[in-house]
């Protein structure tokens, strides 16, 4: 699977893929990444990629020409590319989106800067828009990395243990049950005894019960949908 990042600051993103699971996935050929900097295609004589908002408003917007030309270039090179814009006004990205997007061959993440992107770019090129929450970041790079990580870990072979994907939070519309490791007793706080008895059927039932309790406490919105 291939991921492209359209960003004015590729170094911010590049470092994230230089270690750990996603680096191994790249080395093993499970995923690949590349970068497109709109500044490379700007026709502005001063190499600018931003301008004041028409009609007034604080701050600057990314101008349409560099982004339009960059995205058109990507679509010419890769007609199947699925272009995703990151915006706080968009719908929240959820786990089901990650599982759906992993079926795409090529995803392009467009990272905004300044006060955002000229709306005409979004209207022409966006296949989807996503938000990672009701808050504002200084740029879209972090959000792009979040989405890429969430999608990439669903690519077959990226995680060493595929079972991990089946028992994670949100996979059954519930939060994941509490997990424990050694020591069994730590500072007079013991692991639930049922986990130690080896009865896998009872452990499964216990985990589901704990997952329901955890979801009800931390995410009552999910709990209401489940029950």
UniProtKB/Swiss-Prot annotation:
Cell compartments where the protein resides: Cytoplasm
GO cellular component, one term: cytosol
Binding site for S-adenosyl-L-methionine: 112, 132-137
UniProt key word tRNA processing: yes
Keywords assigned by UniProt, alphabetized: Cytoplasm, Methyltransferase, S-adenosyl-L-methionine, Transferase, tRNA processing
InterPro entries: Alpha/beta_knot_MTases, tRNA_m1G_MeTrfase_C_sf, tRNA_m1G_MeTrfase_TrmD, tRNA_m1G_MTases_N, tRNA_MeTrfase_TRMD/TRM10
GO biological process, one term: tRNA N1-guanine methylation
Main location, first listed in the record: cytoplasm
Secretion signal span: none
Parts forming coiled coils: none
MF (Gene Ontology): tRNA (guanine(37)-N1)-methyltransferase activity
HAMAP family membership: TrmD
Name of the protein in question: tRNA (guanine-N(1)-)-methyltransferase
